[in-house]
C-alpha cells in the first residue's frame, strides 16, 4: 500500500521511530542500580526488538515519493534531537560512572558496553541519515555523532567510496562470499580509513589544493574527536577516557557488523575494461521487519537507499523478492548470526547462490567475484 503525504506527515506515524529514545533511561537505570541492570541495554536492543519483529511482522507499505521535507518534519526532528540527547547521556554517564563507588570495575565496563550498543546501533545510524542531507546543520550534527564514537572518517568513506563503488572490488565494506566477519572486520578497519583519506586527497588534488588545506574535512574530524577526548578526561579523568574509548570501540563493532550484513556476497557484474553495471536494488539485502526498522529508521530498506541515496528514511521504498534479495530476519538477529561463521554461512550462502542464479545465470565462474579479484572500477 502507498501512504499519502498527508498520512505520512502525521506525528503519530513518526512516533514509533522515536522508540530509540527509550534506551536512554535504561542506560541511566544501569548506572544508578548496577547489578543485573547493566545487561539491559544489549538485551533490549538485540533481543527485545527481535521478539517484537516476530510479534508485529513485516511492513511492506511505501510512502508516496511526493512527500516533501515539510511532510517529514517529525521524522527529521527525531534524528536532530537525538544528537543532544546522546551527548548528554554519554558525557553525563562518564561524569557519574567514572568516580562511582557503588559500581565495581566490571559493572562500569558493562554499562559502557551497553552505551556503545546505543551509540553504534542508534547514533551511527542516525549520523548516516544526517550525513546524506544537503542541510549544513544536519551534516554537522552527523559529524558530531561520529566524533562521539571516534569514527569521523566514516562520513568520507561512506559518501565518496562506498556509495560509488559498492559491490565492486574497490569498496572495502562489501563483504565477500565466504569471508567471515572475523576476517572482514580487521580488513575494513585498515582499508576504510585509507580509502577515506585517499578520496579526500583526490578531491583536493582536482582543485589544485594540497592535502593539508583547511578544507580537508579530516581537520574537522580531528578537532571534534579531540574535543570529545578532552571532555571525557575533564569529566572522568583517565577512567572517563577509558570508558569513552570502550563505548566507541563497541559502537564501531556494531557499525561494521551491519556493514558486513548489508552487501554480503552481492556483486555488480563486471562488463569488461574496469566497467561495472549501475547500482540496482538487487545489490543490497532488504529487510521489511517492522520493529527493527523502527529502531534503525528504515536502514534495512537498504536496497532503496543505495538505489536512491538522497531519499530520507521515511520515504525509502520496500522491495519484494522479485527486485531485491531478502534477509530472513532483521538486523538484530542477523548481527548475532554474523558472529557465528558456520551459522552465517548456513543461512546466507544458499541465499547468495539463489541470487546469483536469479540475476546472473550467464556467469558460470564466480571465483574472481568471490576474491574481489576483478579489475578495479575506473
What is each PLM-predicted segment?
Residues 54-68, 267:
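Membrane-helix interface/capping segments
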Residues 8-56, 73-98, 106-120, 214-257, ...:
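Alpha-helical bilayer-embedded segments of polytopic membrane proteins, i.e.
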Residues 2-19, 23-28, 135-138, 143, ...:
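Cytosolic/stromal cytosol-facing helical appendages immediately following the last transmembrane segment
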Residues 121-125, 244, 294, 298, ...:
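Short alpha-helical catalytic segment bearing the HExxH-like zincin motif
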Residues 104-109, 239-243, 276-287:
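Short, motif-level signal for alpha-helix interfacial/capping segments enriched in acidic residues
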Residues 64-189:
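Intramembrane catalytic core of multi-pass membrane enzymes that act on lipidic substrates
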